[in-house]
């Protein structure tokens, strides 16, 4: 499934990104995280940098952005990219998002599993991710899928105090 254009499930498809998707990813992260957590434009700017870096450095052999949709409606997304800061053969899971209307049907789990399968298929040794302690649903899924919390650190990247978390899964 890692290299295919679209992977079908019972109620949604996972497809590779197309032109225009990065703008949608930035928009939905900005709007949704503002509504649910009160996060500001600094978060939206961070997401914009991640998506711009994805486009600038995209290596289709080792990286993917999957879009989940149903009947053309955006339901969620996730990225798997090379961990360019690492000296080992690691990947990073980035920008997992599931729309409120698509929660509770296994979409988040499907997106994470798609990353894991692809990472194994292309030979990564581990997947790392960074999240925040306030994102309980995502943290629950990461734990269920085999990720281990390896480090926490308080930060103010968004202009207020949060606890960042580094998670990792060995493949």
Say what each PLM segment does:
Residues 1-23:
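Conserved N-terminal entry element of GNAT/NAT acetyltransferase domains
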Residues 10, 76, 89, 125, ...:
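Residue-level signal for beta-strand positions within conserved beta-sheet cores that form or flank
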Residues 10-11, 86, 101, 125, ...:
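Generic serine detector
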Residues 16-101, 109-114, 118, 122, ...:
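Acetyl-CoA-dependent GNAT
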Residues 125-171:
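C-terminal "cap" of GNAT-fold acetyltransferases
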């Amino acid at each position: 499934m890692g290299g295919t254009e679209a992977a079908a499930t019972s109620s949604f498809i996972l497809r590779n990104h197309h032109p225009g998707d990065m703008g949608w990813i930035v928009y939905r992260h900005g709007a949704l995280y503002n509504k649910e957590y009160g996060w500001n434009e600094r978060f939206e700017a961070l997401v914009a940098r991640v998506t711009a870096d994805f486009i600038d450095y995209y290596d289709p052999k080792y990286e993917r952005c999957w879009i989940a949709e149903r009947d053309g409606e955006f339901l969620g997304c996730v990225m798997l990219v090379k961990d360019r800061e690492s000296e080992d053969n690691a990947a990073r899971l980035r920008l997992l998002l599931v729309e409120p209307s698509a929660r509770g049907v296994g979409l988040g789990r499907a997106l994470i599993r798609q990353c894991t399968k692809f990472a194994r298929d292309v030979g990564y040794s581990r997947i790392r991710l960074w999240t925040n302690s306030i994102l309980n649903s995502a943290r629950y899924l990461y734990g269920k899928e085999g990720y281990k919390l390896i480090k926490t650190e308080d930060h103010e990247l968004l202009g207020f105090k949060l606890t960042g978390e580094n998670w990792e899964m060995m493949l």
